[in-house]
Amino acid sequence: MSFNAEWSIEEHKTAGGRSHFAEFVAGLTDAKDIKDAAALIGVLRALGNQLREPRSKSLEDGLFELRGTQVRIYYGFLPGRRVVLVGGYVKKRTDTPRDVLRLMRGRLKEVRDEYQKSRVGTAGTKGR
């Protein structure tokens, strides 16, 4: 086993296949923000749960905020060195609006619920 294994980066998708993170990135217009987002994902892939402040901030309920100059990327972890991106935000003021954080927490809850359903669905099929 390699101790330098990269983390798997995944995007949360809705039941309809929509990726809020991909939409966030597609909506970035400032070249600095685009470059910042790409660099942040690279650091996250390399360091995963070893990231600390000021680059990554643990919010509540397992939600994390990856912090660039203005770009914020929201994510959580799943077993197996998996990172799930749930969305992003370009910071325009000193504090992130509560509705943005509430939305990101809701998306992460969806991710965890889907993961639990998949575990329950496969638990009964082992050994068959």
Predicted regions and their residues:
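Basic, Lys/Arg-enriched alpha-helical interface segments
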Residues: 1-70, 79-83, 90-128
